[in-house]
Amino acid sequence: MIKRMAPTLLVLCVAGCMIGPSYHAASPAPEGSRIALPATPDSTRTFFDSLAAARRRDSVAVAGTPVTQRLVVQDSMAGVAWLDILRDTTLVRLVNTALKQNRNLLTAVARIQEYRAQAGGARAPLMPSVTANGSVGSAQVALGFIPPASYHATRVTGDVSWELDFWGRIRHGLDAANADVAAQVAAERGTILSLVSDVATGYLQLLELDQEHDIAQQTLASRQATLAIARDRYQQGQISELDVKQFEAQVAAPAVTLAQTQRERAQATHALNVLLGEGSVEIPRGGSLADAVKALVVPDSVPASLLNRRPDVQQAERQYAAATARLGMADAARMPPVMVTGSYGSQAAKPDNLFNPNTRVYSLQLGVSIPLFDGGRLADQAAVARARVEQARLQYQQAALSALRDANDALVAVHSARDEEAAQATQVEALRAALDLAQLRYQAGLASYLDLLDAQRSLFSAQLALSRSQLQQLTAAVDLYKALGGGWPGGGP
């Protein structure tokens, strides 16, 4: 019987083919294109470059390499490890802790295991299903004109069923399941990317709050010293009580900042503890914010191909592939399924006679089921799958456009923040010199208390603004790494 069916099976195998659309997703970034800064007026660019040059004349990069050389070395962001830009081993340890303990990341890992198990289930129908069956029974047949006849039978068989995947329905299902797994892997990488950037940003915020706290403490000590001088001069009759009250009010300003930074540091610590998967523990500090700013160098342009590394783009592309594969499943489901079923075993009236040559039973069947009328169910399912493919295609294109925008925004932000920080630093140096002169003139009786108060207020505000602009520059760099798909010690994602 098997020999007689072999030609039929061979014809079906030759005639069978995968039905469904072919899949192709265009790269979100053309080969060789770059993401670059917009043009800046020459006069403006020259001014900011002169500020930056003046600041780094006496500075050398943390790693010991001159800044100008590091610009060449780091021309491609793809070769830079995620945290190397900050040169802070404490931050690296915090990130490693978060990668081991963060609950959201552990959930993402468990979700991948779920989808991999589902993919294994999608692969199973490609193989025959084999079962062992046994039965013992009795039956009585009465024909009316003869005495009833009783039958006793014991049956043991091995049964096989196999759907021949001529139209590719099962293979499309496996492709969809594998694409789902890849999409979840990309989602996990996205969780890692967000986690690392969130830890880095939170840590930098803590460093900035530490710096604000130090500025406020130094300013408070300086103003208390000035207040003591003012009180002495009041006792000597050189100034009025109004002048003293003005100085007392000035002392309160940095005290308010101290209270604010203490509260904000506690809140930032709590937020970092959640990211680290820790309880309420103190966050260690490594380098300073100023050191991180000195070490930071970002090129003026980066390869647009780095956008291909972004987890959200990769996830959207794999979801598009999965939707396309499911459309192939829906199209193949409209074709006649071909099944091969068979069994082999033994059947006897008494169990003792099982497996005797004369009790052998077997069957082998080839079946085809042709859908003639289903009320349009299969056609509607294919239409639904086709609509989902279009949705996934548009979502992939939107993810690519959003990635391009994020990268452009982040690149502009990090360089504009650098220019802002350079201008703020120049202002602080000038105001510090102005305050020194104002104090000398006030002590010599050549300037009023208003001149001194104004110089103190201006310097304090400028120092806080400089600290915040340094944080803005560093967080913009973190945003750029996130926008480009990231990278961290060990080769990146």
Predicted ranges, named:
Residues 1-97, 154, 178, 262-308, ...:
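Terminal intrinsically disordered/low-complexity segments used for targeting and assembly
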Residues 154-162, 202, 302, 362-368:
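Hydrophobic, lipid-facing positions within transmembrane beta-strands of outer-membrane proteins
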